[in-house]
């Protein structure tokens, strides 16, 4: 059997059984590299509880943003607009039948916004696209970057709710019933769709070439999930 786990780049290690998730035969091994990102999207969904009729705005069409749109699209009657300044992402959005634009239309207002761009400065722009009591769910990690946010304007008058969806803990809306290991199994099961292979880099990077790869990271600007070959000669 093949298993999925989160672990730093090493060729050999010992883990407890509870740190592993068995990969079902229906899901290709390489596609399971999207598991952590799918868990992020699941947790954000649990944090915000979207439903039929919601108007959704997703900022950032990287892997997390696309997976967020992908699982939200399964909800009947939901409207989703995916935003990314990189027009090359339009092709990927079309593949998943997701409405795409490079800029937020001036009149567009959403009741749930998912910020997946990694750029905290976009938060101020979102103030022009909220309804009363809109929830802004931040999936990005900003590190130690500092950004000024104008909380005293639309965010205040429209009682906006801003939450950070941190994937290390299961959302409080589901923590009574779900453990991290359960959520991981759910994420893997949701990867049973061949279309998701389009998010993964076709070429693999040899484990021993990683230092060279990261030293030239600026040359590798595509958003695809990278695949590392640890030298195990198996067909994945």
Residue ranges and their predicted role:
Residues 1-22:
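Glycine-rich phosphate/adenylate-binding loop and adjacent beta-alpha elements
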Residues 1-3, 43, 55, 135:
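Residue-level marker of beta-strand positions
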Residues 28-102:
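Mid-domain Rossmann-like dinucleotide-binding core that forms the NAD(H)/NADP(H) cofactor-binding site
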Residues 53, 109-111, 197:
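Local beta-strand N-terminus motif with an aromatic residue
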Residues 57, 61, 82-83, 111-115, ...:
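Glycine- and other small-residue-rich loops at beta-strand/loop junctions that grip anionic moieties
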Residues 91, 96-163:
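Glycine-rich cofactor phosphate-binding loops and adjacent beta1-alpha1 units
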Residues 149-201:
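C-terminal substrate-binding/catalytic core of Rossmann-like NAD(P)-dependent dehydrogenases/reductases
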Residues 178-236:
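C-terminal hydrophobic helical "lid"/dimerization subdomain
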